[in-house]
């Protein structure tokens, strides 16, 4: 993997800097590195593809070295370099696609394609120029079963989940009380509602709670907490739990009371915030517990009083909600990130070349299913294919 990264970094620099008119002295070190790459690769043969519709391609390396010059690089010099660069980039692209198409239930973090396994040989260690990539560093740690640490912005840690629970239900669905939620990506939105606006509740207060267990622990998380759940702020028709009928939800938004968010790790409370909104920090957690209250307003103007009558029918439904959004966090496991294209790149390659479903990844790289059942085997394979995708992205946009 380190050799693949060094090849890609060298080729990227060469493509960007070996241009007509450049002083040789400005790129002499790069050209020496480029020549070392050629010397090491010459005389070797590789094969890529042969899985799904990814065609088999054979690669032979027999290139001349780039010479020295006292002056600027001329058109002939650059053209010679370009021919070599383009062949190497095509090779790297195919090695990466071949690797992203493969998976293994055992030691999935190790190279799976024939070409990348060959590049891992001792003879290619002379190409190992640069390992500054965060993904390479973490791949090395994961490969040695040591602690990794990825910094994510908007990590896709929550499997998609959208549902409701009813704490009070009537056959006609005309006087309901409960919670509804939408968890997805890096965001939780949860709403508590009571058609009667806590009319007969103790002290006219309804208590709501929403607990979310993460598939992997996060640390050093920057989080935004808001006293609103905008996705549940408009009318909708909702299918009943048994699918036999539908019920109408027509929310009137109130501000939640006594809001508390707890971050737990292995059942122990690590951080607690009460009635604090905006930016909050969570040190280390694998579970989030949100609790909040709906309080019937003790004093109401006639207009508000008309919204919340003392008896049925209840045309409008009192609703309070919260939004919790993880803006950035550190995780010991590789995850999809809303700010990165790695999952999209891997999925696109596997779809384009009709890669058959293997023993590890779900069909279509379905992220909700993948993260819901995030096994060590999936973690290892994701670590590898995301590392390869990050390398490929240096050369192929």
UniProtKB/Swiss-Prot annotation:
> Which family would the database say this protein is a member of?
Belongs to the rotavirus VP6 family.
Q: Subunit info?
A: Homotrimer. Interacts with the inner capsid protein VP2. Interacts with the outer capsid glycoprotein VP7. Interacts with the outer capsid protein VP5*.
Q: What is this protein called?
A: Intermediate capsid protein VP6
- The residues the record assigns to binding Zn(2+) are 153
Query: Is Zinc among this UniProt entry's keywords?
Result: yes
The role this protein plays is: Intermediate capsid protein that self assembles to form an icosahedral capsid with a T=13 symmetry, which consists of 230 trimers of VP6, with channels at each of its five-fold vertices. This capsid constitutes the middle concentric layer of the viral mature particle. The innermost VP2 capsid and the intermediate VP6 capsid remain intact following cell entry to protect the dsRNA from degradation and to prevent unfavorable antiviral responses in the host cell during all the replication cycle of the virus.
What is an example of a GO molecular function annotated in this UniProt entry? Answer: host cell surface receptor binding
Which BP terms in the Gene Ontology apply to this protein?
A: fusion of virus membrane with host plasma membrane
């Amino acid at each position: 993997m380190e050799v693949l990264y060094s090849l890609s970094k060298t080729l990227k620099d060469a493509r960007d800097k070996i241009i007509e008119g450049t002083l040789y002295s400005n790129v002499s070190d790069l050209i020496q590195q480029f020549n070392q790459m050629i010397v090491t690769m010459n005389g070797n043969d590789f094969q890529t593809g042969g899985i799904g519709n990814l065609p088999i391609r054979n690669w032979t390396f027999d290139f001349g070295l780039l010479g020295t010059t006292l002056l600027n690089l001329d058109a002939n010099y650059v053209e010679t370099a370009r021919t070599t660069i383009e062949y190497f980039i095509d090779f790297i692209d195919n090695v990466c696609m071949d690797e992203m198409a493969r998976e293994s239930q055992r030691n999935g973090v190790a190279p799976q394609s024939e070409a990348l396994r060959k590049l891992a040989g001792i003879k290619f260690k002379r190409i190992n120029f640069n390992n500054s990539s965060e993904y390479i560093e973490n791949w090395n740690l994961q490969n040695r079963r040591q602690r990794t640490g990825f910094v994510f912005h908007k990590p896709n840690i929550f499997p998609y989940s959208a549902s409701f629970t009813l704490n009070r239900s009537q056959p006609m669905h005309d006087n309901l009380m409960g919670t509804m939620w939408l968890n997805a990506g890096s965001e939780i939105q949860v709403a508590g509602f009571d058609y009667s606006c806590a009319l007969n509740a103790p002290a006219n207060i309804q208590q709501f709670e929403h607990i979310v267990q993460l598939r992997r622990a996060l640390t050093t998380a920057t989080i935004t907490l808001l006293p609103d759940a905008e996705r549940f702020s408009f009318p909708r028709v909702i299918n009943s739990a048994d699918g036999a009928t539908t019920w109408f939800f027509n929310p009137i938004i109130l501000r939640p009371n006594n809001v508390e968010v707890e971050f737990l790790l292995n059942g122990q409370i690590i951080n607690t915030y009460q009635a604090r909104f905006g930016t909050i920090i969570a040190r280390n957690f694998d579970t989030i517990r949100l609790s909040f209250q709906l309080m019937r307003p003790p004093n109401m103007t006639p207009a508000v009083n008309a919204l919340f009558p003392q008896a049925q029918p209840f045309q409008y439904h009192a609703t309070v909600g919260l939004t919790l959004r993880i803006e950035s966090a550190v995780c010991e496991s590789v995850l999809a990130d809303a700010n990165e294209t790695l999952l999209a790149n891997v999925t696109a390659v596997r779809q384009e070349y009709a890669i058959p479903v293997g023993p590890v990844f779900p069909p279509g790289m379905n992220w909700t299913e993948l993260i819901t059942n995030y096994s060590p085997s999936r973690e290892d394979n994701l670590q590898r294919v995301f590392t390869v995708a990050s390398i490929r992205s240096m050369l192929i946009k």
